[in-house]
Design a protein with these regions (language model features):
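Extended, charged alpha-helical coiled-coil/arm scaffolds that mediate oligomerization and mechanical coupling
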Residues: 2-140
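Short loop/turn elements that form and flank the Walker-type P-loop nucleotide-binding site
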Residues: 150-153, 176, 195, 203, ...
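The Walker A (P-loop) glycine that initiates the GxxxxGKT/S ATP-binding motif of P-loop NTPases
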Residues: 157-159, 196, 227
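Conserved alpha-helical scaffold flanking the Walker A/P-loop in AAA+ ATPase domains
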Residues: 200-224, 256
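Glycine/charge-rich, flexible interdomain linkers and switch-proximal surface loops
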Residues: 106-109, 113, 134, 140-163
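Conserved catalytic/switch belt of AAA+ P-loop NTPases
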Residues: 225-256
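Walker A/P-loop
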Residues: 146-185, 214-215
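AAA+/P-loop NTPase substrate/partner-engagement loops
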Residues: 175-205, 212, 232
Length: 256
């Protein structure tokens, strides 16, 4: 479930292009080598063992194995250390992602109502929207459709300062029994903060969304995108473009 708040905005997750290599921490270019080359270097074997013992999806494991096999041929090359640093940093991040970890939803409407009421007075529209979502989830569970993908709603909180936009978010997470993560937008000026940097950079890092998943060690947390109206003027348009990608129901299925 995604949440975001703003003090001044009124009501109103593009696909990654592998050819241009503006890929995030999950992205690995498709290899032209079909055969996985043998790995003999001890450091590369350690990295491969780290990947094999992790919960990284098999397709990604296979691609990383290909990269490691190619890198093994460069052990005596001057470019080896730089390439090793890149792949080691990449593997360090992808193995931290909680690929198969989710929290079990607590679909007790009475309990959820009590939690929401105990933290905030009023805000009935928000509370009813959350309870409506939980009701649909509970109904699907009773019909044996619990494992069916249910797109999480995006709630847009608009209001004056001090009306509970930020504080209601952790209450919603508690009511659902999910982990909670907050991403502050105040002063943000670079869309790469959200999208992540290309793995080809030595200091590359994933975006704040992926970092939030790593921090809470869950793939289905409630994420609050806080104070989106306070991004810098210079980066506003590009950051809002990334938000469209993240919040578009047709593109954010991986964050549900």
């Amino acid at each position: 479930m995604g949440l975001f708040s703003s003090d001044t905005v009124t009501k109103s997750p593009k696909p990654v292009n592998n050819d241009q290599d503006n890929n995030q921490i999950f992205s690995v270019p498709k290899e032209t080598v079909d055969e996985v080359l043998p790995i003999t270097d001890s450091e590369l074997l350690r990295l491969k063992s780290l990947v094999d013992s992790s919960s990284v999806p098999q397709e990604l494991k296979d691609r990383i194995s290909v990269r490691l096999g190619q890198l093994n041929r460069l052990v005596n090359s001057p470019s080896y250390l730089d390439e090793y640093d890149r792949i080691a940093r990449y593997i360090d991040w992808v193995t931290k992602v909680p690929w198969n970890k989710t929290t079990e939803d607590i679909l007790d409407l009475k309990r959820a109502r009590q939690i929401l009421d105990s933290h905030h007075y009023g805000l009935e529209d928000i509370k009813n929207r959350v309870l409506e979502y939980m009701s649909v989830m509970k109904l699907k569970a009773e019909k044996g459709e619990k494992n069916e993908v249910l797109k999480a709603p995006t709630l847009f909180f608009v209001g004056l300062v001090g009306t509970g936009k930020t504080t209601i978010a952790p209450s919603i997470a508690e009511a659902l029994g999910r982990k909670f993560a907050r991403i502050p937008f105040g002063g943000m000026g670079d869309p790469l903060d959200l999208r992540g940097q290309s793995r080809l950079h030595l200091e590359s890092e994933p975006g704040k969304i992926v970092k939030a998943l790593i921090s809470v060690q869950s793939m289905n947390p409630v994420i609050l995108l806080d104070e989106i109206d306070r991004v810098t003027e210079e980066g506003r348009s590009s950051i809002m473009g990334v938000l469209v990608e993240l919040l578009d129901p047709k593109q954010k299925f991986c964050l549900c």
